[in-house]
């Protein structure tokens, strides 16, 4: 996966040329770019955060009648910036994955869009047509907690529920999943 397309491996990925497909332009995409079948149509889609601008989007993959590939950009959250790490996990235990992420604060000390905006940790639930935003934490820096470059999702208490561990500019925070 590259910002302007993807590489298709040959039959033997250790020898032979890889084929570049110039199918899309992800701009200043964060790392990672998630490759998941968001809408469950059997085709892999892309989920991309903007690490240094505004926006969190998913790119729906569609195939035309003759196999031509198209990528349709859908906004998930165009109103927040500095989405770095994103994870696709079943946070609420319903058997369906949610998109978990957070907004970073002052990523490059005065050089990124929205650097002084409120920070937060969120998950986005897919309803079959679009994502709905669920707030885990939000507020101005010092009150709300965001995510740094990376965060972790794990069952810290052995209760079967995934918790979120979010490092930020003002410390490390654990969000215990109380269920319900």
Q: Which residue ranges define each predicted feature?
A:
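Beta-propeller-forming repeat regions
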Residues: 1-180
């Amino acid at each position: 996966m590259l910002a302007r397309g993807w590489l298709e491996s040959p039959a033997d990925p250790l020898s032979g040329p890889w084929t570049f497909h110039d199918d899309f332009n992800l701009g200043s995409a964060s790392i990672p770019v998630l490759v998941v079948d968001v809408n469950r149509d059997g085709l892999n889609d892309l989920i991309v955060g903007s690490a240094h601008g505004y926006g969190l989007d998913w790119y729906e993959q569609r195939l035309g009648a003759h196999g031509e590939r198209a990528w349709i950009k859908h906004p998930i959250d165009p109103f927040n910036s500095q989405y770095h790490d994103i994870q696709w996990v079943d946070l609420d235990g319903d058997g369906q994955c949610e998109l978990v992420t957070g907004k970073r604060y002052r990523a490059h000390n005065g050089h990124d869009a929205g650097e002084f905006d409120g920070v937060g940790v969120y998950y986005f639930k897919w309803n079959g047509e679009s994502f709905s935003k669920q707030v885990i934490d939000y507020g101005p820096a010092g009150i709300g907690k965001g995510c740094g470059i990376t965060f972790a999702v794990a069952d810290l208490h052995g209760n079967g529920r995934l918790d979120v561990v979010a490092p930020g500019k003002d410390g490390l925070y654990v969000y215990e999943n109380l269920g319900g």
